[in-house]
């Protein structure tokens, strides 16, 4: 069995998550792989989560915060350069989740931090959570990835997660928040580089003690890797694609209601694969044509404020006599989507 160590110099989350998939799907069946990486400001959601439930999409767009959807399950997390992320990839027959946690705990001990496992997924120092993990398994391989809070901006956890309730009745997984702490609270000198070095050392030591050897070099990955590895570029394009980040959202219903001076609008949008598949509007408005036009305009549109605004603008041009009412509905719906 061989050891492989990769470290990303790129902070684009789509690149790093694509690298995970690339390694996972091209894994040498005779190797244990460690991948270390960190992201610029990003909300990463689990494979089965709804970004409109978990995130403040509009604020993220305004602040140039990435949205990424990972292949594995679990809850929504906020990443910035104060997070260090680790991924262990192994052949399924030789996968040892306990060993992975042991390596991280041993690395933290090298830095004077006593951590332990909390439940199945988390690590903590005292009663403070400092790491969460998620897992993925196929017939012949497994991976375990997690985040270590080094010096993350805790304020921004609240800035981009947990939006204003929109009456979204989602079928996906709702994240559970926990008390968390940064590792710098326990060692003020720790940073991404010192932690990465400690994890690499602990990884080599663990497998040296089990006769795998400790000579694995560190492979540095950067943007040039996309050009050198066509398969990696393919995974990158998928991670960056709107249809993956939004379109893979579980089915949900958005129900909102308001009163305009021309009537009540009770709007129900059934959203599947991030597109509005069914529109139901109850209204006491006198103009029945307006209600029919609104339903027709929203049907099969992406659940995206820019696409919805474009459809309403198109409807305005086609029916200028209804412009005031159309504008009312457009501003209201988009405002509700923004939270």
From Swiss-Prot:
Q: Which CDD domains match?
A: LplA
Going by the record, the broad EC class of this enzyme is ligase
Tell me the residue numbers annotated for binding (R)-lipoate: 129
Which reaction(s) are listed as its catalytic activity?
A: L-lysyl-[lipoyl-carrier protein] + (R)-lipoate + ATP = N(6)-[(R)-lipoyl]-L-lysyl-[lipoyl-carrier protein] + AMP + diphosphate + H(+)
Domain BPL/LPL catalytic stretches: 28-211
Give the metabolic or biological pathway: Protein modification; protein lipoylation via exogenous pathway; protein N(6)-(lipoyl)lysine from lipoate: step 1/2; Protein modification; protein lipoylation via exogenous pathway; protein N(6)-(lipoyl)lysine from lipoate: step 2/2
Superkingdom of source: Bacteria
What compartments host this protein?
Cytoplasm
The record's EC number reads: 6.3.1.20
* Gene3D superfamilies for the chain: Bira Bifunctional Protein, Domain 2, CO dehydrogenase flavoprotein, C-terminal domain
Single Gene Ontology BP annotation: protein modification process
* Primary location group: cytoplasm
An example of a Pfam family matching this protein is LplA-B_cat
Q: Which UniProt keywords apply?
A: ATP-binding, Cytoplasm, Ligase, Nucleotide-binding
Q: Which residues bind ATP?
A: 70, 75-78, 129
Q: How does it assemble?
A: Monomer.
The UniProt record's further free-text remark is: In the transfer reaction, the free carboxyl group of lipoic acid is attached via an amide linkage to the epsilon-amino group of a specific lysine residue of lipoyl domains of lipoate-dependent enzymes.
Q: What does this protein do?
A: Catalyzes both the ATP-dependent activation of exogenously supplied lipoate to lipoyl-AMP and the transfer of the activated lipoyl onto the lipoyl domains of lipoate-dependent enzymes.
The record's similarity note reads: Belongs to the LplA family.
User: This protein is called what?
Assistant: Lipoate-protein ligase A
What does UniProt list as this organism's lineage?
A: Bacteria, Pseudomonadati, Pseudomonadota, Gammaproteobacteria, Moraxellales
Gene name as annotated: lplA
